[in-house]
Each structure stands twice: as C-alpha cells, then as structure tokens.
Design a protein with these regions (language model features):
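Short, glycine-rich nucleotide/cofactor-binding loops
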Residues: 1-5, 188-191
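His/Asp/Glu-rich metal-coordinating catalytic cores
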Residues: 3-163
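Accessory, non-catalytic peripheral segments of nucleic-acid enzymes
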Residues: 169-236
C-alpha cells in the first residue's frame, strides 16, 4: 500500500489472495504503510497461504512445500537509515532462499548490491522504487509498481516472473499495466498552425495508443501571429 491501509482494504486484499490455489504469498510493510502502533497489520488474520512478516528485525517464513525460505522485515517507521540488509545472512533453512527487501536510498535502508550478493541468496526481490530496474542479472531486481502511481512513473509497469531450479535463477520482466504515462515531444516551426499541431498530436497518439496518458512538450519556434489554444488540442 502507498499509505496506511484501512481494515476493509486488508479484507478485500485477503479475499483476492484467497483465490490463489497453488501460490504462497509473502509480504512486508514498506515506508508508506509502515507498521505503526495502531496498524491493522498487527492483528489482521491472513489466509493460510498468505504470510506477513511484521517483525522490524530480519525474520524468515519457511515454505516447506516449495522448499523455499523467504527472509525480510517490515518498516515500523517512515525512515530507516541503517543498512539492515548488509548482514542479513540466510540461515540455510531451505533449499532455496530469497530476500524480500524494501528501500535503496539514504533514508530507506541504503543498499550496496555487491555486498548483498555476497550473502548467498538465490534471489533478492526489492521494492520501493516504482520503476522496474535490474540490479544484478537474474539475482536482484526492483519489480516496480504494478501500475503507475503518479505522473512521474513513466514507462512500462508490470511484475517480475522468476524460476529457481538447481541450475540457478532466471527472471524476466512481464509488462502488465494497460496504460502508461508517456512524455512526448512535438516539434513546431513557423509553418505549424494550431490546426496542424492538433493533427500532429492526434496522429502521434493514434500511433502510440489512445489508452496512454501523455505529457506533450512543444519544441521550436511558432509564428508570432499564431496562438496555440492548448485547451483544444485534445482530439479524443
């Protein structure tokens, strides 16, 4: 959640996750939905296959059916300045071991990718940054948010699909969000009238997709006698 969740929202989320029949779900709270004193996370009862790591210290969920241990911790405050993950060594509880982490900047658990890679996890799943980002090939990545949360979240959004076998870990980014925020540039010159500009924008959107949300920047120099009525440029 990008804020403190309401009880009804946890119930809705749990109801959706209950529909998963062959999946184990492991979650932690981040800096926006951190576990404060009266957080509903503290008392909520999740479905049997949904596991919430509420501890502010590194803890572990063991998933015997899939021979996997997931390590992580939840935020109990908006900021954590200590590099908590630097010494979060896996304990060898299961065949496969994953670190579920949140942060990456100086105010939210600073990280050093090289240091974390020396710990020995099969995979490190990071959250906090909204844009998908590969840190170490097939070993460490930010999945990003499933959907863009504000106009700054440009580009594709989706999830990371991974497979861990005896041969190692393989991951791939799967685009999933139907809509994107896109920043586009339209060049103008003295020959471009308001009508021509509107058609340029219309053609560009038709080519890239009407479902997306656009921020359009005009570059160049217009005829001083021409005035672009920007409120009338939306042709859809």
């Amino acid at each position: 959640f990008h804020r403190q969740p309401l009880l009804r929202e946890l119930k809705e989320m749990n109801s959706i996750l209950e529909m998963l029949e062959h999946t184990e779900v492991v979650m932690i709270a981040g800096n926006h939905d951190y576990i404060k004193k009266n957080s509903y996370y503290r008392t909520f009862s999740w479905a049997s296959h949904v596991h919430m790591i509420c501890s502010q210290e590194i803890d572990c969920v063991e998933l015997d059916r899939i021979q996997t241990a997931v390590y992580g911790c939840s935020y109990h405050s908006r900021e954590i300045h200590d590099p908590v993950y630097d010494h979060a060594v896996p304990e060898g509880r299961q065949k496969y071991e994953i670190l579920l982490a949140h942060g990456g900047d100086e105010k939210h658990i600073p990280i050093k990718s090289n240091q974390i890679m020396t710990l020995g996890y099969d995979y490190v799943a990071f959250g906090h940054i909204h844009k998908p980002q590969l840190l170490v090939e097939n070993r460490m990545a930010y999945a990003g948010s499933l959907e863009p949360t504000d106009t700054g979240d440009i580009g594709r959004h989706g999830y990371i699909e991974g497979r861990i076998t005896g041969k190692g870990c393989q991951i791939r980014f799967v685009p999933h969000a139907l809509r994107e925020y896109r920043n586009c540039e339209v060049k103008v010159d003295k020959s471009v009238t308001g009508h021509v500009l509107r058609q340029k924008i219309t053609d560009m959107i038709a080519e890239q997709g009407m479902q997306h949300m656009y921020k359009i920047t005009l570059t160049g120099y217009r005829d001083p006698d021409i005035w672009y009525e920007l409120d009338h440029m939306d042709s859809y």
